[in-house]
Amino acid sequence: MENKSIPQATSPLAAWLSYLENLHSKTIDMGLERVSQVAARLDVLKPAPFVFTVAGTNGKGTTCRTLESVLMAAGYKVGVYCSPHLVRYTERVRVQNSELPESAHTASFAEIEAARGEISLTYFEYGTLSALWLFKQAQLDVVILEVGLGGRLDATNMVDADVAVVTSIALDHIDWLGPDRESIGREKAGIFRANKPAVVGEPDMPHTIADVANEKSARLLRRGVDWQYEVQENVWRFSDAQGALDNLPLPQVPQPNAATALAALRASGLAVSEQAIRDGIQQAILPGRFLIVSESPRLILDVAHNPHAAAYLAGRLKSLPKTGRVLAVIGMLHDKDIGGTLACMESVVDSWYCAPLEGPRGATAEQLMEHLGKGAIYSSVAQAWHAAMADAKPEDTVLVCGSFHTVAHVMEVMDAGRTGGE
């Protein structure tokens, strides 16, 4: 008899996601043994002839997007797995920079459900297996995997990377990864492989990353030592052991991440022309990362949710021509460094619009206000955003930040407004 509690291949995606959220006893359960067993049964441990794996506290998404953009410009068929999503689950898997239909995801979930037997999987492990299965079906040239949490014990690390990338190291997820940059660096370097390039974009690299590279006999390529970049006026220059690339176009993604992606591409040995590099760098853009949505007032969406990302965001804001005020809509998760994140932003924000985030991890607006001397409390992200937009004059900037969830809420409200107006 059919088990009504387990969705089928033809079930709606929402039914599957609800099922996956309640499948495992723990939301996060670090370790590769269970998920690797199921991956072996599905034969997805080699999802493509060439694999990049990208870890790091911040900058993973834009580094992956730059890799994808340049490789596609060079003629490769590329798949990207990233998380979390902003609005739709299907954002997590891209093939040739396009999302797949929900039916493809539900078909993959049904395959995993059949293969896992009695093995319990977390939501993220299920999603990772699904991405690998979808990539295998698509017969790709290159797959780019964004690590979910850490590196060493993350589900993506069941796949052997041909090039491993660590974008940056800062304090985040300390409950899982350790209390300092050295312990976090060791976890992230767990994606390194013997005799394979290990590209590090963090300029202040923890010693543990070099230790792991030595232990694993990985080929460490460090920013500022083995490769470097320099921004000049309206162009930039990249150099490594292979030589220099001059007069590169400035990227739309953060400069360090574009440079890290370029270092990884050049270390890969894949054939990529200089023209593909130039075209790919110019075309790479990722929603929610210093995304300027509109002007008058200027609306900027950024998922910055820790001090490292907030400091970068503050710097970007300072680099813009100063016109009016900066009104910030903020919602955060309570397990983040709220005080440290807001402190990095206080010098550039004139007025705060504090909103709670739903769910057990969401911080209340009152918790945010404890760290701020100025601002107002609202009952939802949507209400805070509407209030900020109503208060903003044409010369002002409205910034939405603090979490993927905060940005996603505003994007959904904006989409609903556009749809409602049709």
Residue ranges and their predicted role:
Residues 199-217, 232-235, 266, 298-299, ...:
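C-terminal helical cap/extension that packs against the catalytic core
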Residues 185-194:
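Membrane-proximal helix-turn-helix segments that form the acceptor-binding/catalytic region
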Residues 84, 88, 127-176, 207-245:
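Extended acidic/charged loop-beta regions that coordinate divalent cations
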Residues 50-54, 62-79:
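A conserved segment at the C-terminal end of the G1
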Residues 48-50, 137, 142-147, 154-165, ...:
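Nucleotide phosphate-binding/pyrophosphate-handling subdomain across enzymes
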Residues 81-84, 200-202, 214-231, 248-252, ...:
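Beta-strand->loop->alpha-helix junctions that form or flank phosphate-binding loops
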